[in-house]
Structures are given as structure tokens and as C-alpha cells.
Regions:
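Active-site neighborhoods and metal-handling regions in enzymes and metal-associated proteins
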Residues: 10, 17-642
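The N-terminal extracellular segments of secreted preproproteins, especially immediately downstream
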Residues: 1, 15-18
Length: 642
């Protein structure tokens, strides 16, 4: 009987693997054909190279399907990646979060992986300067800074080889160039628009924000400001939508002068009538002096602006190259003022009402995650086969029970064993791994709520773990605790603090490639700036009110991945004769599993922090949990002895 069953399982797995291989080969051929079609377009237009951005006209991290051009062309599904195609080469440039994923997804497509932020690797601008003279790009999807880097590299290369008679270079702006190849390309999304009740859910009134921006404009001699980043516009106008998955944003542009505010946005309608939510929102906006214009009217709006103002302020890190070219058709180059948008910093410092809502939101989010972890451990312990996908869906279901839930803040990362070695593992609906009662399971997830945005990662021992898994688990946790305990002088940047999270790993000659921390929006994007905690230099100091992730990790290809992530609030920590001091308050409220911990590797201070944190989680969440989950959590949060 057992032998027959094993043979049946073996044959079933063999068939599944064969089908998977055949499907991969079929898709690889499709992507190869698309690249060849693009080369045909290049030949007809005399382009040496085409560069394709993984972003959209608003520099979004998560573009809507219409702008997922990298995915359509190559099959790569990571959130960060740009493609270069020449007549004899196709390459994808992405960072360490996606190296393993890219190697798998690009197999057979003819697209070569180029690693970014790795010593010795050539970035796109330099590569283009060495391999092309005429470069075409969709200017709608490349920001001004990125295009200037390409132009600068190509110009420098031209100067170097001028004596050899090298031809002049050119960067061709070809908006929506993929329309010629992508027959069923999606349209720009249009979803209902809602406004936020800040009296109920925290924040600052729209009129106050607009008044603040106008004061900033007066102080900085800016007659007009063009905002193109969707989260900045959503924050300033207190509007939300669902044009982009996981991000409550509305695709739009915004012009602000001392005389008017014009919002360029697509208007969702049915049978010629606005949907009720949008109609009410537009009425409210109009009452606050916001003029509603059609999205595509941005071009005429910029032309009108040229007749009304002598200059305009823009942020070249988010303004797309095509719109910039249109601005230059209206304004002299010296009248287009580049700078960092003031909205980015103002948005990152949460108000007292937002902070209070966030504290409660992280408690409610913690209840959902604890219920999920209890369910998962119980199911796996009873011998039931729970797949990564089922686990992910169950976690989402627990979150969906929370009042004010508006969806996930990003795609759940539900990864068991080797899958967790991919920092941004994409859990497949079909064929995802079964979670076994041994080793490590990593779950990185978050929710969008009217009262804030959450993000949390827990690495969970599902049963017996190897000595290496335990050591890695403990070293990563030491780094997270070190950063959590940090006290630092005002003016400190995340660049200064990053080493705290890495030092325990570095001492063991281990490391991780991604950043340690990113800013988090308030019912906005789960990734925001200007602050960050990473080894790359960022001049932005951490300020009281900023909410940032604390998430060191460690990844061993083919074995396991570990990441511990809490969200921390920067707050004041008093003063001394040496100045003003800051510290972190941990907002995340979910226990840290200690069953894979090596206590002897933790200092007494680290153990004290861990025990105090777990006790806080238990005392806060136990009254809100079902009785069986509360009993389970009591066992999970018992103090660890050294």
C-alpha cells in the first residue's frame, strides 16, 4: 500500500515538473519573440538601444498593469528592474532582493541579468555610453534625473572618443512606444475617488496643507509647483483611490500657484455620470478651491501656466522626462527650478493624531497576525498540508476582519525553507511549497487601514531547526534589537545607524544586500522617504514623528531566509549638555518566537529587551484574542533565561 502510494506521488510530481518545464519553455519563447519584435521597431527607427523602465509616469514603485512593460517584455515580476535592448543584447538591471528570482524567470528568454549596487558591475548609463549612440525611451516612464544620468554618461563618452570621429549621441523621447507591439495593453486605470475625514482618522485639513505649501512657495520664490508623485498628491489633497494595487492612490498631476490649485485626474463615470463617491469628493475638493481637470489636460494646463507664471518648481526625481520636455517648450530652461519636493519631508513626519491612530492600528494588526500564527502552527502540527499560498490567504482573511481594513499594503511574502532565501519571494497560487513541521517559515505582510499602513515580518520556527538556522536566526535578531535600543543625537541619519543592525552579522562574516529600513506612509505607500536606514549615504536626518521599518535579514540560497521586522517611531529622548537626543518606540505588536533562539549569543541587555517586548505583546494583545490563542501566546512569550 505504502509503496503504491509513494510511486503514485512520484509519478504525480514528475508530471507536474514536466508540465512546469514545458510551460517555462513556452513563455520563454513568447518573451524572446517580443524582444525580436522590439528589435524590428528599433531597426525601422534607427535606434541603437531601447531602455525600458519598470516604473510609470509618476515614478511609482508599484505601477499599474498598463506600465508593467518589463514584465510584459521579459517575464520578470520583481518590483525593481529596468531593461536595455540592443540588436545583439538584452539585459535586466535589478538589485540584490531579486537576483535569485531574476535568474529563474529570465532563463531561456535571452535576457541577461545585470546586478545593481554590486562593485564592478556596470550601471545602465555607463553601459549605454559604451554600446549605443541613439537611445530611445518612453519619456513618460523615466524621471528627469535618470535621463540626465544617461545623457551625461553618453556625453562624457562622446568627449573621450571625439578624436576618433564617433557620431553624436541622442536620447529619443518616444512616449508609449510599446503601444506598437503590445496589442492588448491595458488602459490607464480609473477608480472611484474618496476624501479622508481627518477629524475621524487623523491628519491635517486639506486647506491647511495647501496654505502651508503656498507659504513654502513664497519663502522659496516659487510661483508655481508641479507635483507628479501620486502619494504626495494624495497626501496634500487628502484623497485616496485604488488605481494602483496595494497603494490607495489616484493617477493624476497637480499644479499649485498662489491663485489656484488644479488637479488633473481621470473621472470615473457610468453612463456619463460620476459615481456617487467621486461626485461627493469632487464637490468637497471644489469647495476647498481645487479645480478638477481631465488627466490628459495637463499639457494644456502647462501651456496656460507659461502665460501666467515666469517659472515653475519641479522635483526631477519624480517628474517624468516627457512632461519635462513639454515644460521646456513653455518655459525657458532657467525658469524651471529643480529641487526636492517639500511635500516628501512634511508627509513623513506624522502628526500627533496620526501617531495615536497608528499605535492602535498596530495593536489591531498584531491581533490578526497572532491569530494567523496560532492557526498555522496548529494546522501544521496536526499533520495537515498547508501551502504557502493557503497560509497567505488565511492571513489576509484575518486582517480583513479589522474595521477600517482597505486591503493589503503589498503582496504577502509567504515563504517556507528555500523560498525565503528570495527577499521578495512571490508566492505562487499553484505549486507553492507545503509548510512542514521543521525549519523556518518567513511571512512579510502588511495592511492598509483608514488609520494607517502596517508592515511586519516574522520568521517562524515550524519545528526542529538546524544549528545553522538557529545561529542565523539569533544573529539577525541581535541586529534588530540593537537598532531598536538605539539612542542617538538629533541630526543622526539612517546611514549612521545602519551598522548597528549589521554588526552582529559582520562579526560572523555574514551580511544582507537590502536596506535595513524604509519610511512608511499613513494610509499611503508602504515604502516612502525621505528617510531610510541603509549603508548607502542618505543626508536626511531622522526626525521625531518619522515612522520607519527595522528589518535586518540573512539569506542562504537553496537553504533558508530570515528577516525580523518591526516598525519604529522616532521620538524625543531628552537633552543633556551634549545636545538633544532621539530614540525609537516600537509600534509593531506581535511576539518574537524564541524557540530557535540561542540565548548564549545574546547579551543581558538584549535578553532584557526581548523579554520586555514579548511581555508587552502578551499583556496588550491577550485581552483581545480568543482564549485559546491567548493561552498559546502566553507560552510563546515566556521569559528566556541566559
Amino acid at each position: 500500500m505504502c509503496a503504491t502510494l509513494h510511486i503514485s506521488i512520484f509519478l504525480s510530481n514528475l508530471v507536474c515538473k514536466t508540465c512546469k518545464v514545458l510551460n517555462q519553455e513556452l513563455m520563454a519563447n513568447i518573451y524572446s519573440d517580443r524582444i525580436e519584435a522590439l528589435r524590428g521597431l528599433m531597426a525601422r527607427n534607427g535606434w541603437d538601444a531601447v531602455v525600458i523602465s519598470g516604473s510609470d509616469p509618476h515614478a511609482s514603485e508599484y505601477p499599474a498593469p498598463r506600465w508593467q512593460q518589463v514584465r510584459w517584455l521579459t517575464g520578470f515580476t520583481g518590483e525593481a528592474g529596468d531593461v536595455v535592448v540592443t540588436m545583439n543584447h538584452a539585459g535586466l538591471w535589478t538589485d540584490s532582493r531579486y537576483f535569485i528570482q531574476a535568474q529563474t524567470q529570465l532563463e531561456g528568454t535571452g535576457v541577461e541579468l545585470h546586478k545593481t549596487r554590486v562593485p564592478g558591475e556596470v550601471p545602465i548609463p555607463q553601459w549605454l555610453s559604451e554600446n549605443a549612440r541613439v537611445v530611445a525611451l518612453d519619456g513618460l516612464c523615466w524621471n528627469v534625473d535618470a535621463v540626465k544620468e544617461i545623457e551625461s554618461a553618453m556625453s562624457a563618452s562622446l568627449e573621450e572618443y571625439r578624436e576618433e570621429g564617433a557620431p553624436a549621441y541622442s536620447v529619443v523621447d518616444e512616449p508609449d512606444m510599446m503601444d506598437a507591439l503590445w496589442e492588448d495593453r491595458p488602459w490607464t486605470p480609473v477608480t472611484p475617488v474618496t476624501t479622508l475625514d481627518v477629524d475621524c482618522f487623523g491628519g491635517t485639513q486639506r486647506a491647511e496643507k495647501i496654505s502651508w505649501l503656498r507659504k513654502w512657495m513664497l519663502l522659496n520664490d516659487a510661483e508655481a509647483v508641479l507635483l507628479t508623485s501620486l502619494d504626495e498628491i494624495a497626501w496634500l489633497l487628502n484623497v485616496r483611490g485604488s488605481d494602483i494595487e496595494y497603494n490607495p492612490l489616484v493617477i493624476s498631476y497637480l499644479i499649485v500657484t498662489q491663485d489656484y490649485v488644479k488637479w488633473f485626474v481621470k473621472k470615473p463615470s457610468f453612463a456619463g455620470e460620476l459615481d456617487p463617491d467621486t461626485a461627493d469628493s469632487f464637490t468637497e475638493l471644489s469647495e476647498d478651491g481645487v479645480d478638477i481637470e481631465d488627466y490628459d489636460a495637463i499639457y494644456s494646463g502647462l501651456a496656460d501656466l507659461g502665460n501666467e507664471c515666469s517659472g515653475v518648481f519641479v522635483d526631477p526625481s519624480t517628474l517624468n522626462h516627457h512632461i519635462y520636455n513639454c515644460i521646456c517648450d513653455t518655459f525657458p530652461a532657467e525658469s524651471v527650478v529643480f529641487g526636492k519636493s517639500p511635500v516628501i519631508l512634511e508627509k513623513s513626519v506624522k502628526t500627533e493624531s496620526e501617531i495615536e491612530h497608528l499605535r492602535q492600528t498596530y495593536v489591531e494588526d498584531g491581533v490578526a497576525v497572532e491569530r494567523f500564527l496560532h492557526w498555522l502552527e496548529t494546522e501544521v502540527a496536526t499533520g495537515r498540508d498547508v501551502s504557502e499560498w493557503e497560509a497567505s490567504e488565511r492571513l489576509t482573511a484575518f486582517r480583513a476582519e479589522i474595521l477600517g481594513y482597505r486591503g493589503n499594503s503589498f503582496e504577502n511574502i509567504s515563504a517556507y525553507g528555500p523560498g525565503a532565501a528570495l527577499p521578495h519571494y512571490s508566492t505562487p497560487r499553484e505549486g507553492s511549497a507545503v509548510i512542514r513541521p521543521c525549519g523556518l517559515y518567513l511571512v512579510d505582510s502588511g495592511g492598509q487601514y483608514l488609520t494607517g499602513t502596517t508592515d511586519i515580518t516574522r520568521t517562524v520556527p515550524m519545528g526542529p531547526c538546524t544549528a545553522l538556522e538557529k545561529e542565523d536566526y539569533t544573529l539577525v535578531l541581535k541586529g534588530m534589537i540593537a537598532l531598536s535600543m538605539a539612542v542617538f543625537p538629533r541630526g543622526t541619519t539612517g546611514h549612521h545607524l545602519d551598522v548597528l543592525a549589521r554588526m552582529p552579522l559582520w562579526r560572523a562574516k555574514r551580511n544582507f544586500g537590502h536596506g535595513t529600513g524604509h519610511g512608511i506612509g499613513y494610509y499611503l505607500c508602504v515604502h516612502e522617504g525621505p528617510q531610510s536606514i541603509r549603508w548607502q549615504y542618505n543626508p536626511q536626518p531622522l526626525l521625531p514623528g518619522m515612522v520607519t521599518s527595522n528589518e535586518p535579514g540573512l539569506y542562504r540560497e537553496g537553504m533558508h531566509g530570515i528577516r525580523h521586522e518591526n516598525i519604529v517611531l522616532c521620538r524625543e529622548a531628552g537633552s543633556s549638555e551634549f545636545g538633544d537626543w532621539l530614540e525609537f518606540e516600537t509600534l509593531t505588536c506581535c511576539h518574537i518566537d524564541t524557540s530557535a533562539l540561542l540565548p548564549e549569543l545574546l547579551s543581558s541587555d538584549e535578553l532584557a529587551w526581548l523579554n520586555a517586548y514579548n511581555e508587552h505583546v502578551y499583556s496588550t494583545l491577550a485581552p483581545l484574542l480568543p482564549s485559546d490563542t491567548a493561552l498559546w501566546l502566553r507560552d510563546k512569550t515566556l521569559p528566556v533565561e541566559s
